[in-house]
């Protein structure tokens, strides 16, 4: 799955027409460059590892985890995917902690792997479900909440109309762009974003990128 050139073109045209403030952001940021990641299991593992820590710390831990996986699979073909559920389950909780994961994140990562191995979460067919059904399927796994599921929908399945109303970055961007005194609540976010539909994912990406314009 990926964002098609036609979808991106239609989204940018729609968003520029429906929202003058967003149109200015689109002009300042430039082309939409997000790419959907094909490694679905790996995307979810990376999301769990990255929760509530800095970008730099998350990248360091992910690098160590991927190196440990490669070391454990030297005799196996990599096929471009460092993550697979069976390999994650071969590590003990203590081994994952030694790599840098907290006990909680190590448990969450193995829980995800077990759900995939058992077939409770079928990542090979999950794209056939609608957005809300995918969210419900994923949040049954400890460590995966609605936000993580929404990030998966956008950045792995390239779903076009996802609005992460609880994302701090988007809320901060909306406050800045629309001149609000405080961070918007869920109702305010949905009201502001209503014109963005059916391209809320594209608009959300531009909101995230708008934060870089102020740096």
Regions found by a protein language model. Give the residues of each.
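Generic alpha-helical structural context detector
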Residues: 46, 63-67, 110-114, 154, ...
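Short secondary-structure junction/hinge motifs that connect adjacent elements
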Residues: 24-42, 79-80
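C-terminal accessory module of base-excision DNA glycosylases/AP lyases that mediates lesion recognition
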Residues: 1-32, 132, 146-215
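Structural motif
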Residues: 34-42, 100-104, 193-200
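Alpha-helical ds-nucleic-acid-binding substructure associated with the helix-hairpin-helix region
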Residues: 25, 53-54, 58-140, 197
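Short, aromatic/basic-rich helix-turn unit that serves as a nucleic-acid recognition element
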Residues: 44-48, 52
């Amino acid at each position: 799955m990926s964002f098609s050139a036609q979808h991106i073109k239609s989204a940018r045209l729609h968003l520029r027409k429906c929202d003058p403030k967003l149109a200015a952001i689109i002009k300042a940021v430039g082309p939409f460059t997000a790419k959907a990641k094909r490694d679905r299991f790996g995307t979810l593992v990376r999301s769990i590892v990255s929760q509530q820590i800095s970008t730099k710390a998350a990248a360091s831990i992910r690098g160590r985890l991927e190196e440990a996986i490669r070391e454990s699979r030297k005799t196996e073909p990599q096929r471009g995917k460092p993550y697979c559920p069976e390999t994650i389950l071969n590590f003990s909780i203590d081994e994952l902690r030694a790599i840098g994961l907290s006990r909680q994140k190590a448990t969450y990562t193995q829980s995800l792997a077990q759900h995939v191995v058992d077939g409770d979460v079928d990542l090979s067919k999950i794209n056939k479900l609608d957005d809300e059904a995918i969210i419900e399927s994923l949040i049954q796994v400890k460590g995966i909440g609605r936000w993580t599921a929404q990030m998966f929908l956008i950045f792995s399945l390239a779903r076009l109309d996802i609005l992460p109303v609880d994302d701090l970055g988007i809320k901060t961007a909306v406050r800045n762009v629309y001149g609000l005194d405080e961070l918007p609540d869920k109702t305010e976010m949905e009201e502001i974003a209503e014109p963005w539909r059916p391209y809320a994912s594209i608009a959300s990406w531009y909101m995230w990128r708008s934060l870089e314009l102020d740096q």
